[in-house]
């Protein structure tokens, strides 16, 4: 069970996008995430007449390491860590600072 999942709001802790917030769009593998509006790179694409795609420079979301982001706690307005707690026989993610459940 992952501490940071798809559709979680996260905040970037280090790097050129430090302080930016975004929503996790997908997990690339166990250690990398693609976050909306964070770590955007410019990529050159060739025109492809088969698909109708025009060539040029496009913005592409690049993966960011999971250690460089943290969950955003809306109640406190700060970055927070996640832990797990057993509630009614179910494993639930909770914020470490407050102990309340992470809302998806």
From Swiss-Prot:
A Gene Ontology cellular-component term: ribosome
GO MF entries: rRNA binding; structural constituent of ribosome
Pfam family membership, one: KOW
GO terms, biological process: translation
Stored InterPro entries: KOW (IPR005824), Rib_uL2_dom2 (IPR014722), Ribosomal_uL24 (IPR003256), Ribosomal_uL24_KOW (IPR041988), Translation_prot_SH3-like_sf (IPR008991)
Annotated keywords: Ribonucleoprotein, Ribosomal protein, RNA-binding, rRNA-binding
The keyword rRNA-binding appears for this protein: yes
Domain of life the protein comes from: Bacteria
Stretches that traverse the bilayer: none
Family statement: Belongs to the universal ribosomal protein uL24 family.
Subunit structure of this chain's protein: Part of the 50S ribosomal subunit.
HAMAP family: Ribosomal_uL24_B
Function, as annotated: One of two assembly initiator proteins, it binds directly to the 5'-end of the 23S rRNA, where it nucleates assembly of the 50S subunit.
Record's protein name: Large ribosomal subunit protein uL24
Protein source organism: Herminiimonas arsenicoxydans
Classification of source organism: Bacteria, Pseudomonadati, Pseudomonadota, Betaproteobacteria, Burkholderiales
Name of the gene encoding the protein in the UniProt record: rplX
């Amino acid at each position: 069970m992952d501490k940071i999942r798809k559709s979680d709001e996260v905040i970037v802790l280090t790097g050129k996008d430090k302080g930016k917030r975004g929503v996790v769009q997908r997990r690339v593998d166990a250690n990398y995430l693609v976050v909306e509006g964070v770590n955007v790179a410019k990529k050159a694409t060739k025109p492809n007449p088969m698909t109708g795609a025009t060539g040029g420079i496009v913005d592409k979301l690049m993966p960011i390491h999971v250690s460089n982001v943290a969950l955003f706690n809306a109640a406190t307005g700060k970055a927070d860590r996640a832990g797990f707690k057993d509630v009614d026989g179910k494993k639930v993610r909770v914020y470490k600072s407050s102990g309340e459940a992470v809302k998806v």
